[in-house]
Amino acid sequence: MLSCQIQGNGQESIALCCDFLAQRLSICMDIKMRNTFEERRKELLQGHNTTWVNIFDSTCAYYYAVTGQTERIPTLFGAHMLSTVNFLAPGRPMMEMIENQVYLAQGEYSKVIGRSESILAMCQALHYDLVALHVQIQLLAANWKLGKTEQALELLRRSLSQAFPDGILMPFVE
């Protein structure tokens, strides 16, 4: 696995990206994880780098939200304390998208609708089309759950037309 080759090379940020990908793929594929979430978090804590721990917590929050394990979502996201953490501006849209996923998993559909416009604006400013696609899908799910089927179907059409030319399917699977 790529993350095993990166481990120990001082490329922890890339290893965290690999962890996130492996977590996401494990939802729909039989993928053996290198460590449990608890073991990986313990490794990161030994490095005394809160940025890495917060990034890992964000990936766990996303995984647990998507899989419906809301009781396991790390406190930073589960209690919606994201605003207490400083992230570099380029990372903010992704973190907000993950928090949106947590709100969705917690049944806070109106909150997802209310937050999505500002997240989409951040995505547009930074040209983060993939994060924007995730947010649009969250928005359509929230609208659907609230019985706003016309808005949800329009968002689905828009999202599909945006994703299919590039063969982007993972956000729809999740």
Roles of regions detected by a PLM:
Residues M1-S3, I31-L44, Q69-S83, S110-L120, ...:
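Alpha-helical repeat scaffolds
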Residues Q5-L21, I31-K32, L44-C60, S83-I98, ...:
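Alpha-solenoid helical repeat architecture
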Residues L25-S26, Y64, Y103, Q136, ...:
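Residue at a conserved register position within TPR or TPR-like alpha-solenoid repeats
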Residues T59-G68:
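Basic/polar, acidic-poor N-terminal "presequence/leader" segments
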Residues I73, P93, N100-L104, S118, ...:
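Residue-level detection of beta-strand scaffold positions
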